[in-house]
């Protein structure tokens, strides 16, 4: 092989004569163009220099292969480099060394050659006449510790700008501010804002279009079947780009070549963009700005910015009152929580609730409690939109007249919370409720299973006071998901004053009648509220595909629910799995969402089970919050390992045994799940 450059020595190869070899065809091509062929026909060396305009773009991980890879302009199936002259769009210079002469061929190609040769990229390819093996000179990055190589000097120069931080081309679109290494990359990025997609697929029946030729060619591999397939045993995945295949192979090998060089960190990643996102946790960089007027929030990832922008887009409907539904309309969308990202986390609720502990109970209004749950925190990445909060409070106050009037209780003696039941489908009859009996001793704390915190649904010592022991990771609901009773659209329940409804199943008519006939226990200082059962159908959800319902059963003397009650991720997961009975939806569950925090919010509008007017049940409506996992944004193969790890964690989850049912007094909260 021979490689010729100003710094290389000339290496000659002696080849045997062969009348049918591709280089003889090249000699005929040279002869047709007026050059004198060699008398012997023997070629010692053939070197081609490709002259191309510097593209100024560098696809991530697309050109980092090892030495010896063919260049993209080579014609598949051809043995010679320049046999098919029409397929060579770039200009080239070729010289052929023979025993008695040197042939020099200059072809400008079908695309214009650069006017200034200094702005061009010269790619050298050499072919051994004996073995017909071609070799492309690779350009090695000279920065210490960088193993990247490139087939063109232009791509190498672009890559080296990443080491120097030369992101000089900045997007001037409002609210963007992204910077790029080359002007070409900036032009491609602007098409994201303008929605321009000039490269359309020409396959009949396919209407897809793309903003770059690179993405179009990758898409067309799906039509031609020339994809990059994973050859690992048992893996049948395929990809449209070589870089995606390389990233996927790392999920099999466990290779993580991108390592954080900050002191004391040492974390490694399989993809370079994951490392870039991680480095921002050290530097505190937040390059993504919210473009909305009056919003000065910044974010470290584009995913976080998009999640935040949904709050601005849905500002008029995110927390507004429910739309008016006729009795015949579908009520699956009666629970509106379209923007879950703006709700406070459990730690924020504990911190914010302490500010209202010293207030007089008679002065605490629903709006004050609700506003305290949405107060802004110091972290700009998780701050809540004040306009969104104001709209939410207004929507609550707008329906305040429909809330049942509650006389203020004396002191802090009575503070109860709400049980919660998830039900789906129809398979078994509901279990009868235990009769309410008057207590002869102080009511014991409800039994919630091993490892649970008794403060989950117990009466707190003071109103709005968080529990002494945090419970974000405790087991709050101890039962197997198969034991949840399926529940049809329940008819409205009879309102019975002084009745304590036990969570687990709707109260039957016989149970209600027996409870009415029994004498009511003596009350202390407060007037009991009528207990009611409200069935809420959940909206359509990618996880809860069977539209399970939430049965909310307030107990008498209901007050304000503690804002720091948390259900563990493990326990909620089997609730979701139980609600999703279709086996074909398991893959959807694995990819759809991740339970990050579960806590109880207040003042959420709900709809009546009979389709009547919108009604709000005080301040004690429990809500399950499912936050979307912040996953990789790149649509790349590096997400495969994360899916496998998530599936492994779900297989290892085991639910604790169900607790024994215990009768509860009327004044105490009840949490009893069906056997």
Curated annotation (Swiss-Prot):
GO terms for cellular component: cytoplasm; nucleoplasm; nucleus. Pfam families: zf-C2H2. GO terms for molecular function: cis-regulatory region sequence-specific DNA binding; DNA-binding transcription activator activity, RNA polymerase II-specific; DNA-binding transcription factor activity; histone acetyltransferase binding; RNA polymerase II cis-regulatory region sequence-specific DNA binding; zinc ion binding. Ubiquitously expressed. Gene3D superfamilies: Classic Zinc Finger. Residues 427-464, 645-675 are annotated as: Disordered. The modification Phosphoserine is found at residues 5, 304. A motif (Nuclear localization signal) lies at residues 132-137. GO terms for biological process: cartilage homeostasis; cellular response to zinc ion; DNA-templated transcription; positive regulation of DNA-templated transcription; positive regulation of transcription by RNA polymerase II; response to cadmium ion; response to oxidative stress. SUPFAM superfamilies: beta-beta-alpha zinc fingers (SSF57667). Keywords: Acetylation, Activator, Cytoplasm, DNA-binding, Metal-binding, Nucleus, Phosphoprotein, Repeat, Transcription, Transcription regulation, Zinc, Zinc-finger. It is found in: Nucleus; Cytoplasm. The modification N-acetylglycine is found at residue 2. Residues 655-675 have a biased composition (Pro residues). InterPro entries: Zinc_finger_trans_reg (IPR051061), Znf_C2H2_sf (IPR036236), Znf_C2H2_type (IPR013087). Disulfide bonds: none annotated. A zinc finger (C2H2-type) spans 139-163, 169-193, 199-223, 228-252, 258-282, 288-312. Zinc-dependent transcriptional regulator of cellular adaption to conditions of exposure to heavy metals. Binds to metal responsive elements (MRE) in promoters and activates the transcription of metallothionein genes like metallothionein-2/MT2A. Also regulates the expression of metalloproteases in response to intracellular zinc and functions as a catabolic regulator of cartilages. This is Metal regulatory transcription factor 1. It comes from Mus musculus.
């Amino acid at each position: 092989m021979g490689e010729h450059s100003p710094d290389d020595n000339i290496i000659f190869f002696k080849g045997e004569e062969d009348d049918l070899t591709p280089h003889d065809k090249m000699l005929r091509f040279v002869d047709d163009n007026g050059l004198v062929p060699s008398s012997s026909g023997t070629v010692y060396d053939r070197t081609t220099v490709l002259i191309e305009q510097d593209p100024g773009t560098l696809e991530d991980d697309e050109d980092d292969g090892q030495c010896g890879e063919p260049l993209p302009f080579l014609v598949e199936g051809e043995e010679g480099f320049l046999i098919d002259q029409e397929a060579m769009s770039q200009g080239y210079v070729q010289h052929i060394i023979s025993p008695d002469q040197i042939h020099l061929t200059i072809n400008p190609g079908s695309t214009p050659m650069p006017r200034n040769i200094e702005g061009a990229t010269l790619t050298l390819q050499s072919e051994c006449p004996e073995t017909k093996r071609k070799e492309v000179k690779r350009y090695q990055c000279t920065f210490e510790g960088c193993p990247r190589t490139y087939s063109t000097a232009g791509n190498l120069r672009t890559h080296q700008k990443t080491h120097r931080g030369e992101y000089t081309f900045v997007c001037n679109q409002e609210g963007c501010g992204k910077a790029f290494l080359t002007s070409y990359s900036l032009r491609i990025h602007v098409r994201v804002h303008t929605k321009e997609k000039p490269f359309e697929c020409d396959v009949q029946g396919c209407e897809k279009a793309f903003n770059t030729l690179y993405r179009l060619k990758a898409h067309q591999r799906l039509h031609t079947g020339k994809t990059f397939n994973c050859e690992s045993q048992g893996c049948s995945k395929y990809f449209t780009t070589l870089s995606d295949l390389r990233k996927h192979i790392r999920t099999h090998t466990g290779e993580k070549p991108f390592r954080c060089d900050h002191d004391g960190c040492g974390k490694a990643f399989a993809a370079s963009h994951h490392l870039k996102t991680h480095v921002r946790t050290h530097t505190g960089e937040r390059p993504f700005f919210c473009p909305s007027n009056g919003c000065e929030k910044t974010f470290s990832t584009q995913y976080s910015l998009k999640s935040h922008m949904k709050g601005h887009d849905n500002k008029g409907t995110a927390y507004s009152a429910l739309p008016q539904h006729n009795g015949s309309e579908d009520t699956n969308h009666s629970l509106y929580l379209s923007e879950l990202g703006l709700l406070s986390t459990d730690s924020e609720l504990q911190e914010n609730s302490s500010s209202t502990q010293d207030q007089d109970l008679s002065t605490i209004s629903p709006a004050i409690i609700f506003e305290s749950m949405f107060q802004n925190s110091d972290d700009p990445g998780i701050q809540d939109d004040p306009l969104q909060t104001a709209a939410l409070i207004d929507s609550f106050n707008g329906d305040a007249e429909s809330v049942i009037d509650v006389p203020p209780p004396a002191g802090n003696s009575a503070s109860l919370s709400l049980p919660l039941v998830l039900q789906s489908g129809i398979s078994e009859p509901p279990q009868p409720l235990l009769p309410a009996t008057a207590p002869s001793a102080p009511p014991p704390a409800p039994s919630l299973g091993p490892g649970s915190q008794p403060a989950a649904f117990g009466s707190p010592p003071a109103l709005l006071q968080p529990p002494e022991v945090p419970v974000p990771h405790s087991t709050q609901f101890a039962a197997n998901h198969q034991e949840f009773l399926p529940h049809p659209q329940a008819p409205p329940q009879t309102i019975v004053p002084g009745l304590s409804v036990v969570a687990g199943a709707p109260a039957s008519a016989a149970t209600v009648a027996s409870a009415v006939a029994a004498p009511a226990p003596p009350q202390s200082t407060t007037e009991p509220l009528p207990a009611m059962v409200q069935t809420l159908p959940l909206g359509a959800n990618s996880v809860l595909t069977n539209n399970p319902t939430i049965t909310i059963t307030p107990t008498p003397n209901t007050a304000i629910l503690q804002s720091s009650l948390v259900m563990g991720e493990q326990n909620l997961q089997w609730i979701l799995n139980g609600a999703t009975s279709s086996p074909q939806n398991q893959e959807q569950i694995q990819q759809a969402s991740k339970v990050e925090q579960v806590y109880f919010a207040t003042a959420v509008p709900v709809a009546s089970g009979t389709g009547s007017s919108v009604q709000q049940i005080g301040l004690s409506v429990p809500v399950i919050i499912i936050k979307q996992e912040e996953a990789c944004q790149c649509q790349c193969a590096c997400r495969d390992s994360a899916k496998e790890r998530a599936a492994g964690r779900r297989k290892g989850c085991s639910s604790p045994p169900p607790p024994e049912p215990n009768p509860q007094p009327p004044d105490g909260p009840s949490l009893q799940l069906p056997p």
